Amino acid sequence: MKYDIIGDIHGCLQEFQNLTEKLGYNWSSGLPVHPDQRKLAFVGDITDRGPHSLRMIEIVWELVIHKKEAYYAPGNHCNKLYRFFLGRNVTVAHGLETTVAEYEALPSHKQNMIKEKFITLYEQSPLYHVLDEKRLLVCHAGIRQDYIGRQDKKVQTFVLYGDITGEKHADGSPVRRDWAKEYKGTTWIVYGHTPVKEPRFVNHTVNIDTGAVFGGRLTALRYPEMETVSVPSSLPFVPEKFRPIS
C-alpha cells in the first residue's frame, strides 16, 4: 500500500484541495480519490485557526469512517474539540474559538450532525497508526521508540503534545525536547504539531507540519517514496510561530 500523509491542516481547506490535486487526487466525487488507490493519512489538527474547520471534519469523517479509505490520528486540537463537544470545561482559545464560531453559526440540527461526526471520528481512531508491517507510524506530535505499542496516559500526552518539559516560553507555549534526535528505531515516524519552515528529516522521523495556517505551506509525505510535496498557504506569514526546535 502507498500512502500520502498530510501535515496539520487547521481548517485550511483550499490548501488541502490544492495539495491533494498536486498529489494526483481527483475531487469530481466531492472527495479526494487517487487513480492508483493511494491512501491519505492525517497527522491530526484538522481544525482550528483556519477558515473551514467544519468542512474538514466532514471530509475526514467521510474518508475515514464512512468509506474507510483513509487514516486519521488525532492531535491536541482534536482532543480539545472532542472535550468541547462532550460538554467539558475547556478554554475556547488558541484557535478553538474559530471552530466554535463556525459551529455556533449553524442551525441546531447541523450542529448535532457535525458534533456526532467528530465524536465518532475521534472515538473510532487510534492514538497512532502503525502501517506497512510496522515500517511506518503516523501520529500527531511524535512517539518514542519504547512507547510504540502502548496507549497509556503518558504515551497519550507525548503523542498529542510532544516531549514537553513542563516549562513555558515567553509567549506561553510549552518548551519541548527534541525527541527525534534520540530516536534510534527503524520504523519511520511521520508527525506534525511543531511548525517548521521545511519538512524535517531526523533519523527515521519526519516532521511535515510546515505551518499552513501560519502562512507557510501545507505538506504531504509520499510513502514509500519518502518524497515531500507542498503547496503555499493563502494566509499571512507569522514568523514567530516557526520556532527553532531545541
Curated annotation (Swiss-Prot):
GO CC term, one of those recorded: cytoplasm
Coiled coil: none
Cofactor field: Ni(2+)
Keyword Acetylation: no
Lineage: superkingdom: Bacteria
A molecular-function term among this protein's GO annotations: nickel cation binding
KW Methyltransferase (keyword) present: no
EC number(s) given by UniProt: 3.6.1.17
Keyword vocabulary terms for this entry: GTP-binding, Hydrolase, Nickel, Nucleotide-binding
Pfam families: Metallophos
EC supergroup of this enzyme: hydrolase
Catalytic activity: P(1),P(4)-bis(5'-guanosyl) tetraphosphate + H2O = GMP + GTP + 2 H(+)
Cross-referenced HAMAP family: PrpE
NCBIfam families, A to Z: PRK13625.1
Protein family (similarity comment): Belongs to the PrpE family.
Function: Asymmetrically hydrolyzes Ap4p to yield AMP and ATP.
Protein name according to UniProt: Bis(5'-nucleosyl)-tetraphosphatase PrpE [asymmetrical]
Organism: Bacillus cereus (strain 03BB102)
Top-level taxonomy: Bacteria, Bacillati, Bacillota, Bacilli, Bacillales
UniProt gene name: prpE
